[in-house]
Regions:
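Extracytoplasmic "Venus flytrap"
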Residues: 1-3, 28-34, 57-58, 126-135
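Solvent-exposed, polar/charged alpha-helical surfaces in well-ordered, non-transmembrane soluble domains
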Residues: 2-6, 10, 35-46, 51-52, ...
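Signal peptide-proximal N-terminal region
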Residues: 2-25, 118, 145-148
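Acidic side chains
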Residues: 9, 29-30, 48, 128-130, ...
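Beta-alpha junction/loop-to-helix N-cap segments that form part of ligand/metal-binding clefts
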Residues: 14-88, 97, 157-164, 184-186
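Loop/turn elements at helix/coil->beta-strand transitions in domains of secreted/extracellular proteins
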Residues: 21-24, 47-52, 71-76, 90-93, ...
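An alpha-beta-alpha
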Residues: 92-159, 178
């Protein structure tokens, strides 16, 4: 963001209704805590007077901030929150630059079916239980249904994952054509 703001400001800023505006980035550490993110969004709007917001990292934090930006009619452009649920709530001031998470990996199933001569494939999947990962999972389920493929493993990963031996043992025993895993680095 800093590079973009620097360049835009060097070129004179942005013109709106015949008036030029320069950008300034103000940010705080939300500590990856959704309550804190909502609180800081309110602070940015009410105390710092921001008129435009760049979204936080993750669907969870975006989900916490969106009601605040909606309340104050502040546009928020989101580059890191992709949970489908963000875009089904009717928000008027939330804009995204990426596709929703449910379409992230569905094409992998289409490709696997294509590589398998157009025949359905066996799919193993393991997902964390957060909104983003569950939306990716729903996309895989939709792709499996659409292609006639079978989900042979559908594991839920714990938030504090230290060992995937159980899931990997199932994968080894069932020999799926595709393994899809979605989670987050800690």
């Amino acid at each position: 963001y800093n590079l973009a703001v620097e360049r835009i400001n060097k070129m004179g800023g942005v013109e709106v209704d015949g008036k030029k505006y320069k950008f300034e980035i103000i940010y705080y550490d939300d500590e990856s805590n959704s309550g804190r993110a909502a609180q800081l969004a309110e602070r940015l709007i009410k105390q710092d007077g921001v008129k435009y917001m760049l979204g936080p990292y993750s669907s969870g934090l975006t989900k916490a901030m969106a009601p605040v930006t909606e309340k104050y009619k502040i546009p928020m452009v989101e580059a890191n929150g992709a949970s489908r649920s963000l875009f089904t709530k009717g928000y008027k001031y939330l804009f995204a630059v990426l596709a929703p998470a449910n379409v992230y990996l569905d094409v992998a199933i289409d490709l696997a079916v294509e590589k398998n001569g157009g025949k359905p494939v066996k799919i193993a999947q393991a997902f964390e239980q957060d909104a983003f990962s569950q939306d990716v999972r729903l996309g895989i389920l939709d792709a499996a249904k659409r292609t006639g493929s079978n989900i042979i493993i559908d594991d839920k990963l714990p938030k504090e994952l230290n060992d995937m031996a159980s899931t990997l043992a199932k994968v080894k025993a069932t020999k799926p054509d595709v393994l899809v895993v979605s989670g987050h680095t800690k």
